[in-house]
UniProtKB/Swiss-Prot annotation:
Binding-site positions, ATP: G870, M871, R872, G873, A874, G875, K876, T877
UniProt xrefs under Pfam families: DHQ_synthase (PF01761), DHQS_C (PF24621), DHquinase_I (PF01487), EPSP_synthase (PF00275), SDH_C (PF18317), Shikimate_DH (PF01488), Shikimate_dh_N (PF08501), SKI (PF01202)
Range of residues in the leader sequence: none
Region (EPSP synthase): 397-843
Protein name, UniProt field: Pentafunctional AROM polypeptide
Keyword line: Amino-acid biosynthesis, Aromatic amino acid biosynthesis, ATP-binding, Cytoplasm, Kinase, Lyase, Metal-binding, Multifunctional enzyme, NADP, Nucleotide-binding, Oxidoreductase, Transferase, Zinc
Record family assignment: In the N-terminal section; belongs to the sugar phosphate cyclases superfamily. Dehydroquinate synthase family.
Region (3-dehydroquinate synthase): 1-384
Binding residues annotated for NAD(+), in chain numbering: 46-48, 83-86, 114-116, 119, 139-140, 161, 179-182, 190
GO cellular component, one term: cytoplasm
Cofactor binding annotation: Binds 2 Zn(2+) ions per subunit.
Length: 1584
């Protein structure tokens, strides 16, 4: 290696060909003229670099040529920046241009730019005229240390990056570090990812240099440029040194292995996994950032395989974090730039399969065995199973299989001691060397914060075994807010540390913040104590929690400090450790009762003594401590004891499996209270415990022999209660009948990472273990491990390391493997716990990704209890009952529950005790409901529940933890009208008007709710039915049970109707005809005209009522669209925040689909995507500016990345100027599948573009001739599109039939021909009457056979010709619909049954949407009775009574159905029981007996009795259906009508089941209302 003042050369492949230095332009140009003589030099660069450097280099090259007396041509080519330029077309464009410039084989190409320019221009050089000379002039740090060195050149293809290229060595590489001055900070840091990678993989000495200098390097990187000054001047030598180290390594490796025979792929450390992430996250996330994440994952893989020590993972991770590189896809940096993108493990592994390092199907990854040293001299073969464990969000733990009997496990260093030691060492004078430090998220957060505060610097010795802390007790105002994630210990300790920051000339503030969970954890008592001591601290969000803002003053004043310490001992330790640096000695008084966790306070005092400060406990005052004013002195070396709380898990492993385990460095002399766990908990449970001062050994009893603990106080080891709870679940070896363990003294565990007591109770239930909360503890009913259930939905861990590890112990004895969700939560205290399970305990693990990770406390949304809030009179009780019925939950009115509890009425309570007392009682009832009934209930709150701040906080917390708080909104005028006639409620306090109360509470309702349900204004018709229909759609979306989307995208053609009315009420009358054939309806919110708006766009309230009106009018999904002006709509682009507000509101309304324009800001897109839950998103882009071309779709493809990331469906809309535009679009549609599997809506606007609408097959926007105007130019109707497809041959003519005899009078042909005419289908429907079922055989085999209905007598006989049956047809044992289907290219005939569907639809249309909790009656026991019973069960009937003249036949029908159908046969011969039957109140009745056959008198009497008693106020919901229709009004209908039933004859069922068959055959829906009138007129003519 040679060097001069400004440049250092590094040899590669036997030549001095890589030069690293400053101001190299003259050297570069002289090199070209002297060593690369040519008639033409071609400089290729991009538009980012050209303005800064191109003229400078062309001038320098011209001057060099003059100096040498030559006159070559100097040509320049400037191309667009970015990865999209690294493609075949750009390469061809440059080559064609070079040919046009008469470039020959002596041409020399100069690649001046980043990796894209170097790779692409290098590949041009490799292939132009079979290879020309070139040099690399890298302008980014990443290119300098990576892509420019080694001769790799390539371009990207649609299938992946760098898949086409060549090895072509440059003549030279010039890394001119002056280029870095104009490099954006993020791009510089991106390059640091590669620098760190090289050092971590190859040279620990280089890595140490990087570890020691992040602050000074980042300060220079972020320093603003000043003309005439080099921004890196103060780190000039350091910068060159770290870049040289990386360059030197790469040159050395390339020299040894130019063509990647094995050694060179070591340079791909971090890339196997990093490239997989990059394939998904690029371009939002940069290469070096992805490699950073990949490094961490590959380090974790090395550790998981038992090759790399845990501290090495922590060390490299901290180094990456110190340079602000992301270390996880969950980092804030990733969320900021690409938070909307998902990285499914299956996809990552699939991408990893395409890696040049692989050996066939075997994946190879660079595995490290130490920092600076690889496991092998080439990438190591690793199984997909092991990779999946590291990459997966969740982990599956298999039961113990007796593979080990005696194990020694050393837990990581104590989190409590590690964090205290970091604080004390940072404040101490001198250098402290810490060993056995815990490497975890918590300690990394603490170290990063202390560095940012200027308190200490950190470095590593002994290959990462020793942390060297250079402290001194001086603090400065940090340059940014201190993000503490979910590190509660760090938050509490650093709050007081931050108070020591003194005033400075620059001013500033200290902000402590954290993640969502951290922002609800308490810190109020500590803040109160510090405020009282003169500290300026304010809450930035929630009172009593982070984030905090602290204004530096004169530090801690000192003197007497009073602190409430009954919640957390960490408050005490925080003040104790900082007290010596107060302005005067401190007397710390703990007030409010007995302090919690005294042993942790004692630990802190003992550690302070080790650093030279003695705390004196008062002998005269309880819980009082005297701390002198002093400075800490470093003890030099300080060994951190292993974490005693963590030690409980391996010891519990021994206890539950009957094996032996030793923890060698925790014993009876430990400072930690949890060290008593073995002696005080495991021994009484039946374990043999041996404990020395420094070690603990546990031998468990035989499996199943653990003893329950009647009562154990765990106040001195509260964190260990979770481990004890897991063991107690299978502790049943006792003499008594009850195997109950009671654990007390752990109240503080309710305010840890989560409410741990509630969490354990909830998750134990998944194992079938009964448990419950005590005032300060938990009780657990132990049972045999053989009786445990395997939790089907997995164990939710609440982002709590101890919950995860405790349940990992219990899963060892479950029947089958158990999934533990969010495995990464253990990084807080034992990052490699899963590795220990695998390597030490030989437990089989598997990485899994749950389809939908359960949300907090508990519950998937589908079973979460629903809490209703809203004004009195909004309809909470009515809607609550509907929700309970539809979700099969129980309904509670919390006002009524309060009255029961206090044995009084609310008006009396208010009159006697006042509103304040009432509100407190109301709050208590709500708290009890959430604590005890968080699933399977619906609760209506009183309208004023939001008046109480604590209640609002409770509701908000419930939402954050996964519960549903539904705000019921009703038009204010309607509420006022209703309340004016309702006198049963107490007057508001101070006789306040209802309107004022509404206005005051309205924002509180909005603050507390997770969703909104706007009650529709229904002027006429069946109000209850429409309300139930609206609620049904809402609930299907909110609970994730909606399946329409999946069905719609699988159909050959699907459509949605575009509504463009200024007021939806004007559209209602058009809808029955307009929605024919449609799968959804689009509500264009931007076109609504709010009469009260002065802004030019409608208010949220107005749109809400319009949305509710539409949802009540149709039973179709709604697509909600706010189209901006730039995209062809009316909503002002300048009012983006208001547009986002509307879209977020639509999500809360449970809208089925949201159209999300890609033109909104990334922040808006992310905000909406983050809250989408079960709503589907169409990401749309309308090329109204006509900048995109289907023929050259680069612009479309640039949109595609973001469209697929945010959307479930992509919608691209162009403008057709010629018919060719439509054909180009189809070519794009075909190629689209190579980019993504997301559905595509792609159309052209305008009349010329109509053909594109015909070709589009997924959710094509349509109009209808029934509407007064179209929504967009060129829009077609469903009928027009289907007609066009038919004319083109895309839809072939088909023939449909009715099989049966006699069928001459059937009206089925009329029905189906009407439907064909309405939709444009080229189909026919005919009667096929045959005396034998054999007659249909030839028809079934015809190629144009489209389907058939089957009636008597062939519903059973037809089965012999069918290949398969639907589940319903198989269950009912009869077929009335034959459907030809294609499966793997083979035609099959499928039998279905729509009889039951016809019955269900008839009841729904009549208003009986849901029979939950109600009784039903079926009369008759023939074939149709089965369909009727099936339909009643589908509608949710509680009991289904069956009445038939012949009891034995009724019993036969009953025997067909499972027990859960609750079919009960009525014995009509027992006339003495008639009085009992009148009490049944059957809400739904289906008669299946012929109308012309008189019933026995005993049967008639029973029917009359059964129908006689129905609630007068609910008569419209009681429906009688007679399957007979000759005559139209049957005798039984007359009886039912007399008693108040809504009566329907069988003609409607025939129509409904026929429409159901039509939908099955065609995929198109025709609304019943549109064909009903015509059908009934024709049928009436026939009967009359």
């Amino acid at each position: 290696m040679s060097q001069d003042t400004d440049v250092v050369s590094v040899p590669i492949l036997g030549k001095e060909a890589v030069f690293v230095g400053f101001n190299l332009e003259r050297r570069v140009c002289d090199f070209l003229i002297e060593n690369a003589k040519s008639s033409a030099y071609v400089i290729v660069t991009d538009t980012n670099i050209a303005p800064h450097y191109l003229e400078k280099y062309t001038t320098a090259l011209s001057e060099a040529a003059k100096r040498h007396g030559v006159a070559p041509r100097i040509l320049t080519r400037v191309i667009p920046p970015g990865e999209t330029s690294k493609c075949r077309s750009m390469k061809a464009e440059i080559e064609d241009w070079m040919l046009s410039q008469s470039c020959t084989r002596d041409t020399v190409l100069v690649a001046m730019g980043g990796g894209v320019i170097g790779d692409m221009a290098g590949y041009v050089a490799a292939t132009f005229m079979r290879g020309i000379r070139f040099i690399q002039l890298p302008t980014t740090l990443l290119a300098m240390v990576d892509s420019s060195i080694g001769g790799k050149t390539a371009i990207d293809t649609p299938n992946g990056k760098n898949l086409v290229g060549a090895f072509w060595q440059p003549l030279a590489v010039f890394a001119d570090l002056n280029f870095l001055e104009t490099l954006e900070p993020r791009q510089f840091i991106n390059g640091m990812g590669e620098v760190i990678k090289t050092a971590a993989m190859w040279n620990e000495k280089d890595f140490c240099l990087l570890e020691q200098n992040p602050t000074v390097i980042l300060e220079a990187v972020h320093r603003p440029r000043v003309p005439g000054q080099f921004k890196f001047e103060n780190i000039r030598n350091l910068l060159q040194k770290i870049i040289l180290a990386s360059v030197r390594t790469k040159c050395e490796v390339v020299t040894l292995d130019e063509r990647e025979g094995g050694l060179r792929n070591l340079l791909n450390f971090g890339h196997s996994i990093g490239h997989a992430y990059e394939a998904i996250l690029f371009p939002q996330i940069l290469h070096g950032e992805c490699v950073s994440i990949g490094m961490v994952k590959e380090l974790e893989l090395s550790r998981y395989l038992g090759i790399l020590k845990p501290n090495a993972v922590g060390r490299v991770t901290k180094c990456l974090m110190s340079y602000t590189l992301p270390v996880s896809v969950h980092d804030a940096h990733i969320k900021k730039y690409a938070g909307y993108k998902k990285c499914p493990v299956d996809k990552l592994i699939r991408i990893m399969a395409v890696d040049k390092k692989n050996q066939g199907l075997q994946k190879r990854v660079v595995i490290l065995k130490a920092v600076g040293e690889t496991y092998e001299k080439h990438a190591t073969v690793v199984s997909d199973e092991d990779i999946r464990v590291v990459l997966s969000h969740d982990i599956q733990v298999s039961p113990f299989d007796n593979s080990v009997s005696d194990v020694v496990v050393t837990p990581p260093g104590s989190k409590s001691i590690s964090n205290r030691a970091l604080i004390l060492a940072a404040m101490a004078k001198g250098t402290t060397k810490l060993t056995n430090m815990l490497h975890s998220d918590d300690t990394q957060v603490m170290m990063a914060a202390l560095e940012e505060l200027g308190a200490a610097t950190f470095s590593w010795e002994d290959n990462g075994e020793t942390l060297v802390v250079n402290g001194g007790g001086k603090f400065k105002t940090p340059s940014k807010e201190l993000y503490l994630s979910n590190a509660g210990t760090a938050a509490r300790f650093l709050t007081t540390v931050a108070a020591l920051v003194g005033e400075n000339e620059q001013g500033g503030e200290v902000v402590l913040t954290g993640n969502h969970r951290m922002k609800v954890r308490p810190i109020g008592p500590l803040v109160d104590a510090l405020r009282a001591n003169g500290c300026s601290i304010s809450y930035l969000e929630r009172e009593g929690s982070l984030p905090l803002k602290m204004i530096p003053q004169n530090g801690l004043r000192g003197g007497v400090i009073e602190l409430a310490a009954t919640v957390s001992s960490q408050y005490v330790s925080s003040i104790l450790m900082c007290a010596p640096y107060a302005q005067e000695p401190v007397t710390l008084k703990l007030v409010g009762g007995k302090p919690i966790s005294q042993l942790y306070v004692d630990m802190t005092i003992a550690m302070m003594k080790g650093f030279g400060v003695n705390v004196v406990k008062s002998e005269t005052e309880a819980y009082t401590y005297h701390i002198p004013k002093a400075n800490y002195t470093s003890p030099g070396d300080y060994e951190i004891e292993s974490d005693a709380s963590s030690a409980t898990y391996p010891l519990a492993f021994a206890a539950i499996t009957g094996t032996k385990c030793t923890v060698p460095n925790i014993g009876s002399a430990s400072l930690q209270g949890d060290a008593r766990f073995a002696r005080d908990v495991l021994a009484p449970m039946g374990c043999t415990v041996e404990q020395t001062p420094t070690s603990t050994t546990v031998q468990g009893p035989p499996m199943g022999q653990l003893k329950p603990l009647e009562s154990v106080d765990m106040e001195t080891m509260t964190d260990a209660f979770l481990t004890a709870t897991a063991l107690a679940a299978v502790a049943c070896n006792s003499s008594g009948n009850e195997h109950i363990t009671r654990i007390t003294g752990i109240a503080n565990q309710r305010v840890k990472e989560c409410n741990r007591i509630a969490a354990m109770v909830h998750e134990l239930a998944k194992f079938g273990v009964k448990a419950g909360e005590l005032e300060d503890g938990i009780f657990i009913h132990g049972q045999s491990y053989k009786d445990l259930k395997t939790p089907e939905e997995g164990i939710y861990t609440y982002d709590d390391h101890r919950v995860a590890m405790a349940f990992s112990i219990l899963t060892l004895v479950t029947p089958k493997p158990t999934v533990i969700l969010d495995k990464a939560c253990v990084v807080k205290t034992w990052p490699y716990w899963w590795d220990v399970l695998r390597n030490s305990f030989k437990i089989k693990l598997a990485g899994v990704e749950s389809k939908e990770t359960v949300k907090s406390v508990k519950l998937t949304r589908s079973r979460a209890s629903v809490i209703l809030i809203g004004m009195r009179g909004a309809g909470k009780t009515t809607i609550g009952s509907i929700i309970a019925g539809q979700l099969n939950m129980k309904f509670l009115d919390l006002d009524q529950e309060l009255e029961k509890k206090l044995n009084t009425t609310i008006p009396d309570l208010v009159n006697t005790r006042g509103w304040d007392d009432f509100r407190q009682e109301e709050l208590q009832v709500l708290q009890e409901f959430i604590d005890t009934k968080s699933s399977d209930f619906v609760a209506a709150c009183g309208g004023g529940i939001v008046e109480t701040p604590a209640a609002r906080e409770l509701l908000c917390k419930y939402v954050k933890e996964g519960g549903i708080v539904l705000h019921i909104h009703r038009n204010l005028d309607q509420v006022l009208s209703y309340l004016s006639i309702d006198k049963s409620r107490p007057a508001y306090a101070d006789r306040e008007s209802t309107k004022n109360v509404y206005l005051r509470r309205h924002q509180w309702y909005l603050d507390c709710r997770s969703h909104d349900f706007v009650s529709p204004t229904i002027e006429s018709g069946n109000v209850q039915s429409k309300l139930e229909t609206s609620m049904s759609r809402f609930l299907r979306v909110v609970t994730g049970k909606s399946t329409w989307f999946e069905k719609a995208i699988q159909k050959p053609h699907s459509f949605f109707l575009s509504l463009t009315f200024p007021n939806i009420n004007d559209a209602i009358s058009f809808l029955p005809e307009a929605i024919i054939g449609c799968d959804a309806v689009e509500l264009r919110a931007d076109l609504l005209e709010d009469p009260n708006s002065t802004t030019g766009y409608p208010s949220v309230e107005f749109v809400a009522e319009q949305f509710a009106t539409l949802r009540a009018a149709i039973d179709l999904p709604i697509i909600f669209t706010v189209r901006s002006k730039d995209q062809g709509g009316r909503f002002p682009n300048a009012n983006e925040s208001e547009a986002v507000e509307l879209m977020l509101a639509a999500l809360r309304w449970g809208v089925d689909v949201l159209d999300l324009e890609l033109g909104w800001s990334t922040e808006s897109l992310q905000a909406i995507y983050a809250r989408k839950e079960n709503t589907k998103i169409i990401t749309s882009w309308h090329d109204t500016a006509q900048r995109c071309s289907w023929a050259q779709p680069d612009e479309w493809l640039q949109k595609l990345d973001m469209a697929t990331a945010f959307g479930d469906v992509v919608k691209f809309v162009g403008i057709a100027k010629s018919m060719q535009d439509n054909f180009d679009l189809e070519k794009f549609r075909k190629s689209f599948k190579g980019y993504t599997n997301k559905p595509l809506i792609a159309i052209n606007m305008g009349t010329v573009g109509q053909l594109s609408r015909v070709f589009n097959n997924v959710l094509t926007p349509v109009t209808s001739p029934a509407l007064p105007y179209k929504a967009a130019p060129g829009q077609l109707s469903v009928r027009q599109i289907i007609t066009a497809l038919s004319l083109m041959g895309s839809i072939s003519p088909k023939k449909f039939y009715l099989f049966g005899t006699p069928i001459q009078h059937s009206k089925s042909p009329i029905l189906h021909k009407t439907c064909y005419d309405l939709t444009g289908l080229p189909y026919t429907y005919d009667l096929f009457e045959t005396e034998s079922v054999e007659g249909v055989k030839d028809v079934l085999s015809q190629p144009d056979f489209g389907g058939a209905n089957v009636t008597i007598p062939y519903k059973l006989d037809i089965l012999q010709y069918l290949d398969e049956l639907s589940d319903e047809a198989r269950f009912l044992g009869a077929v009335n619909t034959v459907v030809p289907i294609s499966e793997n290219g083979k035609r099959k005939l499928r039998g279905d049954n729509t009889d039951w569907r016809g019955i269900v639809r008839t009841f729904v249309r009549a208003g009986a949407n849901n029979l939950n909790g109600k009784n039903a009656l079926v009369i008759g026991a023939g074939g149709t009775s089965r369909a009727a019973i099936f339909a009643m069960h589908k509608l949710g009937a509680k009991n289904i009574y069956l009445l038939n003249r012949t009891l034995v036949n009724a019993e036969k029908v009953k025997a067909v159905f499972p027990e859960e159908y609750n079919v009960k046969v009525i014995d009509h011969t027992k006339q003495s029981e008639i009085s009992e039957w009148t009490k049944l109140q059957v809400a739904a009745v289906v008669s299946t007996v012929p109308a012309d056959r008189p019933l026995p008198e005993s049967v008639s009497k029973v029917i009359d009795a059964l129908l006689s008693e129905i609630p007068a106020q609910k008569k419209e919901q009681y429906v009688f259906l007679d399957m007979a229709y000759k005559p139209l009004n049957t005798p039984l209908m007359s009886v039912a009508s007399k008693h108040g039933y809504t009566c329907i004859n069988g003609l409607e069922v025939l129509l409904q089941q026929g429409l159901a068959s039509f939908e099955i055959w065609t995929g198109l829906a025709v609304p019943f209302e549109h064909v009903f009138g015509l059908y009934m007129v024709l049928c009436a003519k026939e009967h009359n």
